[in-house]
Amino acid sequence: METATKTPWHLWVIGIVATLWNAGGAYDYTMTQTRNEDYLRTAADNAGVPYDTMIGYYTSFPAWADAFWALGVWGAFAGSVLLLLRSRFSFHAFVVALVGLAGTTLYTLGTDLPAELNSPMMWVFSLIIWVVTGLLAWYARRMTKKGVLR
């Protein structure tokens, strides 16, 4: 007879915070892909970037870069939800997110970013996304090995 592994309290905390964090990324992705003018104008204003520069940058993405961005965003969101559902596939979703993040990062590094977008804050935020996603993948793997995720 198999004994059920008790769900540790930290899984719920990490899962809820991760889902909220990644829901923010999913919202940003959706608003950007649908070219929501109010959202993009506010984002441009908050970043101190001209609206035309921001919209020009996002509309210049090739399809493959958009695809990697989608993998990163939706993989991370799925991983967070799967973590709350105690599914071992949470780890796999976070790996998909890391692949998407790698593709998006390679595109960004290989692109001539408009000077207004190429700020230290943008690179710091990218690093934060890498760290958070990597830690979530590690956590999901660890919880799978402990039998918490099935």
Which residue ranges define each predicted feature?
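Topology signature of small-to-medium multi-pass alpha-helical membrane proteins
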Residues: 1-150
